[in-house]
Structures are given as C-alpha cells and as structure tokens.
C-alpha cells in the first residue's frame, strides 16, 4: 500500500509553514498492524519530502518528525509493513492529541 497519495502530499505540504502548531489538520494516519504504534501526519517539507511532521503514538504520545522511507521499508512481525488507515479523514491536530493523551483510540 502506498502511504502518501498525491492528495495527502498536497494537503501536508500546504500546511508546512504551520510547523508544530496544533491549529492545523492531521491529514493521514499510518499504523503498525502488528503493534500499537501510530503516526498522524500534519505536514511535509516540499523541499525535503522524506521527513514528515506530526503526532506519534508509540511508547508515549509526542510531536515530532519521522522518516517516510523508514515507515515504507519497515517490516514487523509476520513481515507486515506500516499501513495507511484508509478510513481516516482529516481532523484537527489539537483534538487528536488530546484524545491520545486521554488514552482514547483514534
């Protein structure tokens, strides 16, 4: 499965100038189907599309950058890679962060 579609790239690059500001949308959700990690994409640098910025739910919930190629190349248990949640629709980043910090599923 392709993680970044043209539509997601366009939306993420459009928000690049917002940086880590939570007053923007999360435009995509990636997840490990064999684990509990999730990555919520907020923006992407148009000049360096390798790196994405967003919210990461791993051992803890945090904001930060993550590598698109690392996500694309990762193979976990059972040989499965990171997937994109195809039912996810853009949502305000602030709301997603608060839900995750409260232990809710997004």
What are the functions of these language-model segments?
Residues 1-106:
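Catalytic phosphate/metal-binding cores of nucleic-acid and nucleotide-processing enzymes, i.e., regions
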């Amino acid at each position: 499965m392709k993680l970044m579609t043209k539509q997601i790239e366009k939306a993420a690059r459009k928000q690049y100038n917002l940086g880590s500001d939570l007053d923007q949308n999360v435009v995509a959700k990636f997840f490990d189907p064999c684990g509990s990690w999730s990555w919520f994409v907020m923006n992407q640098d148009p000049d360096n599309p390798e790196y994405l910025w967003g919210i990461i739910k791993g051992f803890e919930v945090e904001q930060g950058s993550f590598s698109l190629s690392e996500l694309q190349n990762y193979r976990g248990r059972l040989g499965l890679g990171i997937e994109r949640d195809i039912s996810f629709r853009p949502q305000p980043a602030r709301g997603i962060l608060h839900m995750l910090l409260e232990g809710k599923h997004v």
